[in-house]
Swiss-Prot record:
It comes from Homo sapiens. The keyword Ligase does not apply. Residues 166-200 are annotated as: Disordered. This is Mediator of RNA polymerase II transcription subunit 22. The keyword Transcription regulation applies. Residues 93-122 form a coiled coil. The lineage of its organism: Eukaryota, Metazoa, Chordata, Craniata, Vertebrata. One of its GO terms (biological process) is positive regulation of transcription initiation by RNA polymerase II. Signal peptide: none annotated. Its main location: nucleus. Belongs to the Mediator complex subunit 22 family. Keywords: Activator, Coiled coil, Nucleus, Transcription, Transcription regulation.
Length: 200
């Protein structure tokens, strides 16, 4: 049986083998069940004692019950094989299922795209309103200071530079303890001779 399954088989041959297995298993169940019913019937006196006949009937019932169980397991295996056959070979159904799934995914994608577009528009509107509010508040602050913000920062930089320039000569001036400043006398040229000497 394993060698037959290993051989390459066409679909028709495989289906025929499934059909034969189904008929054989059902026939086995029916025959064994019928024989069990017949064995349960009380017969007339025979040459065999009743005790021996009872043991023989008991053993026969066990064997036929095992045959019924074996046929049932074979039917369950047949159902599993049929499912596998349909999954692997029923290409139209598989393609239809794939198409339905693709359609569902496309619908879901379109819905997500619509929601994202709506969310983008709402965020754009909110961002525009926030920018207007921000720039209007900034312009009101500049008008309150009578200067634009850029000019205020520029004037602040100029004041800082001028303060640094004034501090440099103050650092170079002499200390008060150095004494009085000496004033140089202007030189006068006298043609007639030396004049009076000026004392500082």
């Amino acid at each position: 049986m394993a060698q037959q399954r290993a051989l390459p088989q066409s679909k028709e041959t495989l289906l025929q083998s499934y059909n034969k297995r189904l008929k054989d298993d059902i026939k086995s169940i029916m025959d064994n069940f019928t024989e069990i019913i017949k064995t349960a019937k009380i017969e007339d006196e025979t040459q065999v004692s009743r005790a021996t006949q009872g043991e023989q009937d008991n053993y026969e019932m066990h064997v036929r019950a095992a045959n019924i169980v074996r046929a049932g397991e074979s039917l369950m295996k047949l159902v599993s094989d049929l499912k596998q056959f349909l999954i692997l070979n029923d290409f139209p159904s598989v393609n239809e299922a794939i198409d339905q799934r693709n359609q569902q995914l496309r619908t879901l994608q379109e819905e997500c795209d619509r929601k994202l577009i709506t969310l983008r528009d709402e965020i754009s509107i909110d961002l525009y309103e926030l920018e207007e509010e921000y720039y209007s508040s900034s312009s009101s602050l500049c008008e309150a200071n009578d200067l634009p913000l850029c000019e205020a920062y520029g004037r602040l930089d100029l004041d800082t530079d001028s303060a640094d320039g004034l501090s440099a000569p103050l650092l170079a001036s002499p200390e008060p303890s150095a004494g009085p400043l000496q004033v140089a006398a202007p030189a006068h040229s006298h043609a007639g001779g030396p004049g009076p000497t000026e004392h500082a």
